[in-house]
């Protein structure tokens, strides 16, 4: 039978004593996590360069077999594009750039060609520098005023012309067109076509108005 212990009190624990260790552990985890992401970026680039090399050195049959053995059917295209986009760099150059940005630049390499060229001039490449260059590339240009167009597109790929509404205080054009339609039994399209043909003939000197 155990004799109850008397006079023993639990020593209070000051949680603040563990704060430096907790903070240090958190920072270590963050460093490890970001380093892991950097390794992923380098692995993506290394694989892209390796795959491009295999495509160049292997026969077409051997290359297709290589992809088939991995169950790939088209997935290789994005990596070949990465290899073509970043061929002048080393994988280590982009260690501080997260993977999705690598895919983004490669997928739109024509759009971001100036960004990629600019990166060649930098001694240090990180997420901030790449993001800044991309944002500058995206700066919207002043829209050029669009020329008025009467053309509308059909679902089958054809097109047709549509004259915009004619607003006149006197309504002369509308009333004249309606009268011609009623009196001559023609459609509005036929009358407009004839009017345009006459105007074109007049401009070309084939028609004179006395």
Swiss-Prot record:
Superkingdom assignment: Bacteria
Name of the protein in question: Uncharacterized protein alr2735
């Amino acid at each position: 039978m155990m004799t109850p212990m008397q006079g023993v009190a639990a020593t209070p624990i000051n949680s603040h004593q563990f704060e430096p260790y907790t903070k240090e552990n958190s920072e270590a985890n963050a460093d490890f996590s970001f380093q892991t992401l950097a390794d992923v970026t380098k692995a993506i680039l290394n694989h892209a360069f390796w795959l491009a090399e295999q495509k160049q050195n292997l026969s077409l049959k051997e290359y297709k077999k290589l992809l088939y053995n991995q169950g790939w059917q088209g997935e290789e295209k994005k990596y070949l594009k990465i290899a073509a986009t970043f061929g002048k760099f080393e994988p280590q150059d982009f260690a501080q750039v997260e993977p999705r940005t690598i895919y983004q630049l490669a997928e739109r390499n024509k759009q971001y060609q100036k960004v990629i060229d600019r990166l060649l001039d930098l001694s240090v490449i990180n997420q901030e520098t790449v993001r800044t260059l991309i944002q500058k590339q995206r700066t919207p240009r002043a829209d050029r005023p669009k020329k008025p167009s009467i053309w509308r597109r059909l679902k089958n790929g054809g097109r047709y012309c549509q004259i915009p509404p004619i607003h006149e205080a006197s309504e002369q054009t509308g009333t004249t067109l309606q009268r011609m339609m009623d009196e001559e039994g023609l459609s509005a399209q036929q009358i407009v076509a004839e009017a345009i043909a006459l105007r074109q003939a007049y401009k070309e000197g084939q028609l004179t108005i006395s």
